[in-house]
């Protein structure tokens, strides 16, 4: 089974964070999906999606890693490297959400669930393994409160329905048909 949030990925790697279960996964898509990485993680101390700076929430959404920071600070807190995400995105800003410095980073401390200030934290050894799957501004990072798992044989019908909805929405948008949107 795979998370339903990745069915539109055409190829390559996708990183998925499940805040409810405090897990991070990497899936690879060729002709089908395969899980290539799984580890425990820690997300924000407070539940829900990030709204404002300092709320100790991890944002939900689709993000991209923008760069790597080596030796970003004390290794017990940040590990040996950090991968900043592009939060807040344009849609976050339009929705009035702010904040900054949302990273995927390591730690050498004991990893406890929901203990970050909003980042996605892994044990440093797991972060080093995760790093091989990260391509800057290319590998999507999907952060979700919880994942809905579907079997791969259900992908085509769900994907077709999503494409139908998006096509319909796009047509209504282009034609300025507000009622249809």
Kindly label every feature range from the protein language model.
Residues 55-60, 69-167:
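Exported/periplasmic cell-wall-interacting domains
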């Amino acid at each position: 089974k795979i998370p339903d949030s990745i069915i539109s990925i055409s190829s390559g790697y996708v990183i998925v964070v499940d805040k409810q279960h405090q897990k991070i996964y990497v899936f690879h898509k060729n002709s089908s999906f395969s899980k290539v990485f799984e580890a425990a993680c820690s997300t924000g101390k407070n539940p829900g999606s990030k709204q404002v700076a300092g709320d100790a929430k991890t944002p939900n959404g689709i993000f991209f890693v923008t760069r790597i920071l080596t030796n970003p600070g004390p290794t017990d807190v940040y590990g040996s490297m950090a991968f900043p995400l592009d939060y807040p995105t344009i849609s976050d800003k339009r929705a009035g959400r702010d904040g900054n410095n949302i990273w995927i980073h390591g730690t050498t401390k004991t990893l406890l669930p929901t203990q970050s200030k909003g980042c996605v934290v892994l044990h440093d050894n797991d972060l080093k393994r995760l790093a091989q799957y990260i391509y800057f501004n290319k590998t999507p990072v999907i952060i979700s409160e919880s994942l809905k798992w579907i079997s791969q044989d259900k992908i085509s019908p769900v994907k077709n329905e999503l494409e139908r909805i998006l096509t319909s929405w796009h047509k209504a948008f282009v034609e300025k048909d507000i009622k249809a949107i």
